[in-house]
């Protein structure tokens, strides 16, 4: 009788669990449908916003507490977010973190450990891309794993630098070099920190340890006075979120593949690509602004003080919104968008390739790494190839205008400044959209179809300028200017 009752009770509990899970799935799915989003996208947004209650709990109950409690809290909350989004597939991140800890401990501060880390973590990520690849953008475990991959590679390099003589390191390397030996709990807390696990930003182990040890504060002995700065970034993120949610059903990359798009005049196709190219980036802007607010709230965003003594909270800023919205150059967009990832690539890839003795080659290899890091689709390679080409041409054009007396005088005419700005912004966002077309459509058959519809305008325009500008420079820059430059 007792065993029968216990069995019935177990069945009821199991059934209740299944029903609860089913209702949760149903309600989330229904809500996502009503919002015009996928369930995975809704889970992602919920998880990002969960960082705020987690940060408030940390501020009120764990700040200045024992460090192991803080590491446990970060690990538990990060794992919970991973499970909520990806279920049992959280084992991918857990496995890579544990193996990374073993690499550091068993191989020590050696170049072998760095190379092993780079090869293993990148191979695991690329294998994940290969086995989960589809023709569309899907939110799956590889999304946070690409963030984790950079964290763990950076951890290995900083640990390696920590064993070198201080004098042999640059000031930047000294700042990030890890002198101590991280424990497994510290590595887990660093990796799973809820404010950055899903979509970034990137930050170093040293910066994370300063947070845990209560050093990232603007007033000694008190909780960071960061609520207002955090709310400002949250509000800005919500503004972009609302705008993106309202407009996303009307401005889609799928429309680029339709016959209706092909049947419109050439100018319309270009203008749609321009508007879509700007708009499509707003989903990334939204996520990064919201997560930056979480980082600021915890104190991780603390970045010292300004000259006037005002605290700076931009250590985890992934966006410079004003620069992003107003700068008419491609290099301005690069400097204002995904800042921490770009800084990571500059610190751990570009500057480490200095031995090649060729800045363009180092930049090209860095962009190749970024393309592979994003995924195996051909569209990523095309996008970053276009970025490389555009930046080179933009620098050539800027140098020509600066060194040519005629063009310098024309550029300085005040009344023409608004016209110049409009032309620059039009070129800027048209070809940003052109590059993003390959990035967002992934597969060669899709982006090739769209590029054909606008006659490969971006490639023809910038490749032509790449070869023509040196001759224009030769014709328009006086010889004395060239000699002065050589001196």
From Swiss-Prot:
Q: Which GO terms describe its biological process?
A: chylomicron assembly; endoplasmic reticulum membrane organization; intestinal stem cell homeostasis; lipid modification; negative regulation of inflammatory response; negative regulation of response to endoplasmic reticulum stress; phosphatidylcholine acyl-chain remodeling; phosphatidylcholine biosynthetic process
Catalysed reactions, as listed in the record = a 1-acyl-sn-glycero-3-phosphocholine + an acyl-CoA = a 1,2-diacyl-sn-glycero-3-phosphocholine + CoA; a 1-acyl-sn-glycero-3-phosphoethanolamine + an acyl-CoA = a 1,2-diacyl-sn-glycero-3-phosphoethanolamine + CoA; a 1-acyl-sn-glycero-3-phospho-L-serine + an acyl-CoA = a 1,2-diacyl-sn-glycero-3-phospho-L-serine + CoA; (9Z,12Z)-octadecadienoyl-CoA + a 1-acyl-sn-glycero-3-phosphocholine = 1-acyl-2-(9Z,12Z)-octadecadienoyl-sn-glycero-3-phosphocholine + CoA
Query: InterPro entries from the entry?
Result: LPLAT_7/PORCN-like, MBOAT_fam
Keyword check for Acetylation, yes or no: yes
Q: What is its EC number?
A: 2.3.1.-, 2.3.1.23, 2.3.1.n7, 2.3.1.n6
**In this chain, where does the modification N-acetylalanine occur?**
2
List all membrane-crossing ranges: 44-64, 84-104, 111-131, 180-200, 227-247, 285-305, 364-384, 422-442, 453-473
Q: In which pathway does it act?
A: Lipid metabolism; phospholipid metabolism
- List keywords of the entry alphabetically: Acetylation, Acyltransferase, Endoplasmic reticulum, Lipid biosynthesis, Lipid metabolism, Membrane, Phospholipid biosynthesis, Phospholipid metabolism, Transferase, Transmembrane, Transmembrane helix
A GO cellular-component term linked to this record: membrane
A Pfam entry, by short name: MBOAT
Bilayer disposition of the protein? Multi-pass membrane protein
In which tissues does this protein get expressed? Highly expressed in liver, pancreas and adipose tissue. Very low expression in skeletal muscle and heart. Detected in neutrophils.
Q: Provide the activity regulation entry from the record.
A: Activity is inhibited by thimerosal.
Where is the catalytic site? 338, 374
Which molecular-function annotations from GO does this UniProt entry contain? 1-acylglycerol-3-phosphate O-acyltransferase activity; 1-acylglycerophosphocholine O-acyltransferase activity; 1-acylglycerophosphoethanolamine O-acyltransferase activity; 1-acylglycerophosphoserine O-acyltransferase activity; 2-acylglycerol-3-phosphate O-acyltransferase activity; lysophospholipid acyltransferase activity
Subcellular location per UniProt equals: Endoplasmic reticulum membrane
- In chain numbering, motif Di-lysine motif lies across 484-487
Major localisation: endoplasmic reticulum
What domain notes does the record hold? Answer: The di-lysine motif confers endoplasmic reticulum localization.
Q: What does this protein do?
A: Lysophospholipid O-acyltransferase (LPLAT) that catalyzes the reacylation step of the phospholipid remodeling process also known as the Lands cycle. Catalyzes transfer of the fatty acyl chain from fatty acyl-CoA to 1-acyl lysophospholipid to form various classes of phospholipids. Converts 1-acyl lysophosphatidylcholine (LPC) into phosphatidylcholine (PC) (LPCAT activity), 1-acyl lysophosphatidylserine (LPS) into phosphatidylserine (PS) (LPSAT activity) and 1-acyl lysophosphatidylethanolamine (LPE) into phosphatidylethanolamine (PE) (LPEAT activity).
UniProt-recorded name of the protein: Lysophospholipid acyltransferase 5
Q: Which organism is it from?
A: Homo sapiens
Organism classification:
Eukaryota, Metazoa, Chordata, Craniata, Vertebrata
